[in-house]
Amino acid sequence: MRAVSWHCLTDLRSFFSWCEQKGYCEINPCVAAMPSKAKRKQIMEAKRGRRKLQALTPVEVKKLLTYCETEEPTLTPYACLCVFGGLRPEREAPNMIDEDITAEAITVPEEFAKDNETRIIEPLSPNFIKWINHIKRREGSFQQVPNLKRKWIKAKKSIGRDWPHDCLRHSYASYHFAEYNDAGLTAKNLGHPDSTLLRKDYNGAVTKAQAKAFWAILPTHCR
């Protein structure tokens, strides 16, 4: 059973349990279909294994940001918002402007957020604040990037391996949870509705040492 199917089945089981309590049904039809405890553990271990491959290493993040800084500086703001802010790369990060970003917090406007609700990302890590200050000293600063898709295709090659699906969001989630050990905070910043699921998915995805190295990446390291 795929993990996504299991999670859907878990939601259905909760719904039918409520129906049982209210007398809307006699039995919960999902109970018999639920995987065993051993099978659930196997599913989660496999998923965490995939998360480790989907997260970029600190070295790969440095390679990416070094490419942006030296070859295409207009990409640096976009890359930092995805890497250190956890913004969605297709809709959120490309549309951020200076007014949305301060050294205290990032505001994702409702028209760009996936759930159509304004999201505040805070607190920001010390290294991210240094990146923000570094970027805002430049002309143009945070704004939409012309030819973003074409430029980003080239930038992704800098890590030296195939680009994992949605790896920047997975990287942020993995390193943020490892650093702060607060699934609720990580889920809130990502715009995820379920902190319990996030905790299961990202617990042990990266080590504390890796998280420390990730959150220590500074602009001076990528020139």
Predicted regions and their residues:
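C-terminal catalytic core of tyrosine-transesterase DNA break-rejoin enzymes
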Residues: 3, 80, 84, 91, ...
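C-terminal flanking helix
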Residues: 13-16, 20, 206
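Conserved tyrosine-mediated DNA breakage-rejoining catalytic core shared by Y-recombinases
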Residues: 32-41, 60, 94-130
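Catalytic-site neighborhood detector that most strongly recognizes the C-terminal catalytic loop/helix
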Residues: 110-116, 129, 190-215
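C-terminal secondary-structure termini that scaffold catalytic or DNA-interacting sites
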Residues: 138, 212-223
